[in-house]
Structures are given as structure tokens and as C-alpha cells.
Amino acid sequence: METLGPPPDGNVTKGTTFIILATVLTSISLITTAMRLGVRITNRQQGWDDLTIALAMILGLVQLVFSGLQYHAGIGRHAYYLGQTQAMDAVKWSYVVMTMFFVIVCLTKISICLFILRIKKTGWLKWVLYTLMAGQVITSAAPEIILFVQCRPVRSFWDRSIGQCWDQSIYNAVVWAHFGMVTTSNCFYNGLTLCKVML
């Protein structure tokens, strides 16, 4: 079996850029979310939209911790320079981060829908938002389920020597459906502004 040589750009890492961006963006999210919740609690106006965004923020902080473990394990470096154990650890922590990602996106989108519903509950708008929330739950749950069942045992996701996994194309198709739902909801939220809907 032919062994691939070292990558032309050498033993470099993009992990540092990744973890810095993740930390900065999570910090901004934490500050703005804390300010929002502080105002809502002070004015005794907290609602379900606040609860869902708070849960998303908590999971985001936990996800950042696991992203740090990813970085420590060598994520962002060429696999050529990683030992087998280190490479497996990088994939393992990536798996944990992925399981949180879909939940965080789902909770954030639901929070936006619930926030709009607090402002205006026009008949057509209400049903569109309920449909978006249902679609978001379904398309977020699907990749989560596949992440847990595509490899048996689950550990074989990062250690392919101990089990079997489904074809990756199945997971990819579901993830594309998820991002299709995210894009659809984003277009709708932007459309509300562009069409100057009186909220």
C-alpha cells in the first residue's frame, strides 16, 4: 500500500483561527443574550423565547469547551501529522460538537419564532411560524438521530476498527435538508423586514 507523503504546506494548523473565532463569537453571543435576559427579567417580561435562547446559549458555552478539546486533540491539522490516538480523539470531540450544533440551531430558530409571536399573532403569520418551528424540529432531529444510529457501536464513529457505519451520503443528505430549512427560515425572517410587515 502506497503511503502518502507530507502535505505541501507542512505541519500547519487552522485550529488556532477556529478556536479564536469560536471564542469571540460565543463571547459576543453571551454578552448580548445576557443583556436581553437582564432587561426581560428586570421588567418581568420573560417568556418562552427567552428560555429557548438561554438554553441555546448554555449549550453554546458547553460546545465551546468541547471545541477546545477538539483543538487540543489536533483539529485543523493535517491527519498526516497526528498519531492514531490523537486523530481518534479529534474525531470523537468533533462528534460531540456536532450533536450539540443541531440542537443549538433549532433552539435559536424557535426562539426567533416565539419572539415574533409575542409581538404579533396575525393568523397567517402565526401558522407560518408554527410550520417553520415544526420543520426546524424535524430537520434538526433527523441528523441527531442519524448521528446516534449510523455507527454501531457509537464509538466506531471515531474508531472504525470496532464496528460498522452507514454510508456517509445518508448523513450528508439529511444535513443538506437541515440547512435547507435554516435557509428557508432565514429568508422568511429577512422577508418580514423587506416587506415592511408591521410587527
Residues covered by each model-derived region:
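Extracytosolic/lumenal membrane-interface segments
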Residues: M1-L199
